Amino acid sequence: MNKRKIELIIAFLIIIIVTISLFIIFKKDSQDFVYKGEKGEYKFDIQQIGTVTFYRPHVFVGGKEYIYAFRNKPQNLEELPLESGILNKLNRQGGLKELYITKDVNLSSQIEGNVNIVTAPMASILGKTDFGIYRIRVNSAYTSFHAGEPVAPTVDCSTVNYNGKVNKTVGVVYLKLGNDNKIYSEGDCIIIEGKDSDGLIKAGEKFAYHLIGVF
């Protein structure tokens, strides 16, 4: 094979590599989108892990970028009811010190073990990890005594609504199954309700989107 043919083959391979690279970049960019939310525009990128698609909003707070992962894009949650001003239920005069995300003992079995999928976005945003914006101590709890592992406290809406008075340092988010997919409150207790596993995940993510200002 002469030198000219080798040069042509190399040039052809370079063209193929560049074309494939541009296609991959274009495909990725074409999947990104900007969503006009309640508090501004949010850039989203899309990530595929196995069979699961994640929608990842980019949030900037105090000059720092936070990226979260959701299973539902905001366009698909717009009609899900969210009580107006519900974040006020987490306001405390001296600052909220602790938040319990509580659920009935049998909830995990009722929603196919997907409790962590429901809570992951909101816990990441609220918590004290590097991903947390609110920097609140977030704990898992049950509404009645739970003898299994790990040991968890017993917390329900009465924990925050005690004799008509609001607990001055603690907040409660109660996950439950019900007749609708929605986010509402009873007193100062925030309730995230879903008709089934999928509905509860959607309601949980709608609340998490609300925490970062998308809704």
State where each predicted segment sits.
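Long, low-hydrophobicity ectodomains and other hydrophilic envelope-associated domains
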Residues: 32-35, 42-215
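Secretory targeting signatures
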Residues: 1-31
